[in-house]
Amino acid sequence: MLLAIDVRNTHTVVGLISGSGSHGKVEHHWRIRTESEVTADELALTIDGLIGDDAELLTGAAGLSTVPSVLHEVRVMLEQYWPSVPHVLIEPGVRTGIPLLVDNPKEVGADRIVNCLAAYQKYGSAAIVVDFGSSICVDVVSAKGEFLGGAIAPGVQVSSDAAAARSAALRRVELTRPRSVVGKNTVECMQAGAVFGFAALVDGLVNRIREDVDGFGGDDVTVVATGHSAPLVLEDLSTVQHYDRHLTLDGLRLVFERNRDNQRKLKQAR
């Protein structure tokens, strides 16, 4: 059983994955709040409480974090609490199998890399990956499995909260799909702007990528969405073909499998 840990700015997803290769399957997953000052001990208590007796079945662990301080604590946690379990953390120097054809590869977020890896491996084609998180990342992977870059926009909830915070007449609202794009009250107006507005933003970016990037104008390009906020706008997206809620966890599994032998040798050497 593989323990997968996906730490983002707002929330963290913890998953347990059985099998490998094409037989890999996310058996359980949990979503918890990310705390930037969390300690390794606190992480261990939380994760051990979530996975319970399955902790005895762990054969590996893989993790990423868009919060550098938490990545350090994840490393300490794995080394102290599961020292016999080989682990891989997505950071510079780790083999991902995805060439990064960008100006500064070290700037590319680990989440973006593993998402593109998972999409390329799963669908076997060039792909556009849309991750709906605290930011919306629209990333591009070529038919050769190369990361070509992408676009980043503020996330749906972040934008709605910012509008409420910067305006005396607006307040924070629950983001659900409104009955119409023409709101009849302030809450519906904000919901319409968020849901329909961001659907249009994503469709616009995907269409622009298809127009501007060589080889992306045909039907052999897969467009896949992931992320906790994706279901909010899926119904109104015309460009997205697939929704894969576990894309990042699958990507972590793929990177672990690529680096597994090296990690086992390191554990044995100790």
Swiss-Prot record:
Transmembrane segments: none annotated. GO terms for biological process: coenzyme A biosynthetic process. It holds the Pfam family Pan_kinase. Its cofactor is NH4(+); K(+). Substrate binds at residues 109-112, 186. ATP binds at residues 6-13, 134. A monovalent cation. Ammonium or potassium. It is found in: Cytoplasm. GO terms for molecular function: ATP binding; metal ion binding; pantothenate kinase activity. GO terms for cellular component: cytoplasm. HAMAP family: Pantothen_kinase_3 (MF_01274). This is Type III pantothenate kinase. It comes from Mycolicibacterium gilvum (strain PYR-GCK) (Mycobacterium gilvum (strain PYR-GCK)). The gene is coaX.
